[in-house]
């Protein structure tokens, strides 16, 4: 029997009060997409410990707090920078740091932001991408009002609405909207992994691959005795879950990368992303297409001295914090951050 629909109090308030504004996932009353949003909008459901309606678990800001908790546990000093900080200060900001650690879901990036990160890596910077579905949508900021963003989904990617014909070019920057992959900048090229699947049932862990045992990168697994890491966590029960990214050479992932581990297997609640489908086909879930519906743990060097460590999963932070941060995944990630921030070579390279 169907269940009664229950609308949470915060959603009831937003239905009755239009003054807080809408997000870029909404449509207007006439059905047209909402293309602009602002960080000045009051957010009633974003705070530490607030469960997300989609998963019944944590998402976004609460998961980022697990990453902060983990950084403090392993004794790594950090500063927090926002999108506006990046846009305003550029390399003057990033060049002060050896390593940039992303949040759990860095989905919306501007062209300037991507250029900044690429320049930082090419100059020897290190990035730890500790999330999933990152660097996905073409995003613009208004020059005179940088707290406002513009998103035009351009009928591409896994999306919540379509941009009508004639309305797919950003007003702020006069560039085409859509996903960066369609613009020739798939995140695989810079981060080694890119969006592969989404689903909001139970997560899973990573199964270590040969590179984690028999390559220079094996040194990062010091203190990690498990063959499967991250099969635990405060978010969906595993380090791999929610929205996940895979290593894919066809999409630009570097051939020289160390693929250290891959997800142990997601269920059919996790479906292949739309941009990977050319036909409407059955059997595109995690159990039927583990070759595509997966998350990969990847490490690679950049010409010029830069390094990238990518995990390809939104729920990773919840596994880092598991058991008071005393677990194999936490030790692995701590080894990476110490290697990235230390004064010596990352893997003994000269």
Q: Which sequence ranges carry the predicted segments?
A:
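Intrinsic-disorder/low-complexity accessory segments
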Residues: 1, 6, 60-66, 103-104, ...
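Aromatic-Pro/Gly-enriched surface loop or interdomain linker
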Residues: 1-93, 345-347
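A broadly tuned preference for mixed-charge, low-complexity surface segments
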Residues: 1-27, 123-128, 133-136, 150-163, ...
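Sequence-level detector for tyrosine residue identity
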Residues: 13, 25, 36, 58, ...
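Residue-identity detector for threonine
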Residues: 27, 32, 55, 82, ...
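Generic signal for short, ordered secondary-structure residues
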Residues: 50, 96-99, 290
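Helical hinge/lid and interdomain linker segments adjacent to catalytic or ligand-binding clefts
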Residues: 56-143, 320, 348-349
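Glycine-rich, aromatic-lined ligand/substrate-binding cores of catalytic
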Residues: 144-147, 152-335, 339-340
